[in-house]
Amino acid sequence: YSNLNKDTLLIHFITNLVTEDYLDEMVATFNKAQKLAFVIASQFSAWQAPLPTRLHFENNFVLFHFSGEDGYYLTWIPDEVSNIVEKYIDSHTELKQLKLAYALLEAASNLYGLYSFTQLQRVYEVYLNKSYSLLDIQKWLKQIELVNPEMTNFRVFNGLIASKGLEFEEDEYHYFVKDAKYYMPDTTQEILSYQELIYGIDDEAEIKFMNWLEQNILKDNHFEAEVTSLSSEILTMMKHAMTYDMVQDVLQSLVQDGILRKRVEFTAENVVKPIYMKMRNWIYHGYTFEEYMDLMDKDEHEQRNNVIDLKQYRK
């Protein structure tokens, strides 16, 4: 070791000390919230960022932290062992399940916008193959809050889970989810894709929309609106829109405000409308507009078939 400098020596010791046995011993000392923080810290390390959390960990060779603001610790996993940790988590039954459960929660929040604890139970039963009681769901959400309530893409309100991008009034929440029929993707892979697809459209559609907006935004508009921020606002609005007419009205108001070119009412028909029709919509609980209309037609047809024909009954 005499020929190694301090940095190289440290890397050598860390990578040789962090074995599967060492990780087993370390994880065995964690409570449930710390295990979740460990899983999320691993994800943050892939983004080259520390995890802000109020949870404290005893000194070890995997999780390092220093004090941040407002009582938070900035916790990170060194690059030298991040791959080792990621592989360990994916091979560890409990940690792997925590990772999937958290990913499903984020994905469901992006897909539905607003949903009940009961729907989260169903998501876990179908895609995690695990049954949770409502009390289990409450405890799970509390554990996430212990890690860091600010890092989530959702918030909990009166027994409901709402995306932080949701723009409904809180007093409308329970009315909105009453008798809701939620879209359930065919595969685990599909629902997990919505963890990244926050607007409910694929990357190709989002790029197409961004290109359209860049061509139609007035560069010298008085509101100093830019493509990135404006696209986020419009796409979020579209997830709340009951019909495409509502989208048209918003685009027209942006024209009147001098933000978009006048031609958008024509070009949007070929670009924005098809995107809206295929968008996973919060108004329709994750269904697209077309899917939900088909669902309503099917329900109406079934109700008509269930009506008793009194004349036939008497016969």
Task: Tell where the protein language model's regions lie, with residue ranges.
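Short hydrophobic short-linear motifs embedded
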Residues: 304-314
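Basic helix-extension-helix modules of the SAP/HeH family
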Residues: 1-76
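Short capping segments at the starts of secondary-structure elements
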Residues: 44-49, 110-118, 220-225, 240
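Charge-enriched amphipathic alpha-helical scaffolds
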Residues: 9-10, 53-62, 127-157, 242-278
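A short acidic, leucine-rich amphipathic alpha-helix
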Residues: 38, 119-124
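Charged low-complexity interaction tracts in eukaryotic proteins
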Residues: 25-29, 71-84, 96, 139-186
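C-terminal helical accessory/scaffold domains
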Residues: 143, 158, 163-244
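Positively charged, polyanion-binding regions of nucleic-acid-associated proteins
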Residues: 20-21, 94-116
